[in-house]
Amino acid sequence: MKLKIAVWVLLLSFSTLLFAQQKKTYTYATKDGQELQLDVYAPDFSSKSEKLPTLVWMHGGGFSGGVRDNQSETKLCETATKQGFVAVSISYRLLRKGTSTYFGCDCPAAEKKETFKQAAIDYMDAVSFLIDHSDDLHIDTDKIIAGGSSAGAEAILSAVYMPEYYLDGAYDQISFAGVFSLAGALVNLDEITSKTAVPTVLFHGIADNLVPYSKAAHHYCNPKDAGYLVLNGSDKIVDRLSLLGTSYLFYSYEKGRHEISGIPFGDLTDVFDFFKSTIVKDTHITKTISR
């Protein structure tokens, strides 16, 4: 019996070690003396040359908090690998951390836009690093999905849909195959064009009190507030995608507030199935799920 227990413990430890070896951490940039890192989670590969669709995830936290390797982000990435994806979770500069206004109605609108821009730049630098090392990391550079929650969603939506507005064409060599946004919004809806529109999954609560579900001021600031900045939320993004004939999967929560920015683990199978269908099989899907 003791021998069986010892063997079982050894096998369990070995399997845990094997799984842990699938996560690797890299520094993709150093800015303002801060090393910006990313974690790459990968499934077992059938061959050294195999490349897979890749989710590149940006955590939330109001641009003042959050970490790339918290429990939820880690679980998301592990789930993605089980679905046959490479998953990456990135750190980025938290430019509102320690400021007196943070990211609310006292934060000037110009600073909010600059925060979106710098976060988008960090995101694109991370993706550039991944593309440069795509052979070693088994990344299919034609099937990169940009994903993020709350502040992270705002950043990735800016990076994917508004590259000319925020990035001045500096990353034109990068293209995305999909978007996965949790309670995100963007400044200019017209920047979503036939060139930038890609299959998109969005989750948003109609009663979101921070990031507007439709078109409204960020944090619902008053017009006289320094931080008054009108954003277009998921509902408006879906309208634009529909107009352009682009695939989308939209989860709309009637009474949902900003907690909908949490990772929807119960729906991840459907989310990844959507990307497999639209990105891999080129199937056209337009679906709204109301809850």
Question: What do these predicted regions represent?
Answer:
Residues 91, 147-149, 180-183, 203-204, ...:
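Alpha/beta-hydrolase-fold catalytic nucleophile elbow
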Residues 1-22:
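Bacterial Sec-dependent N-terminal signal peptides
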Residues 235-291:
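C-terminal catalytic histidine-bearing segment of alpha/beta-hydrolase fold enzymes
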Residues 169-244:
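The feature captures the conserved acid-bearing segment of alpha/beta-hydrolase catalytic domains
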Residues 83, 127-196:
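Primarily recognizes the serine-hydrolase "nucleophile elbow" in alpha/beta-hydrolase
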Residues 20-50:
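N-terminal cap/lid segment of alpha/beta-hydrolase-fold proteins
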Residues 46-52, 57-100, 188-189, 209-212:
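Short substrate-entry loop that stabilizes the transition state in hydrolases
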Residues 107-135:
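Alpha/beta-hydrolase active-site loop
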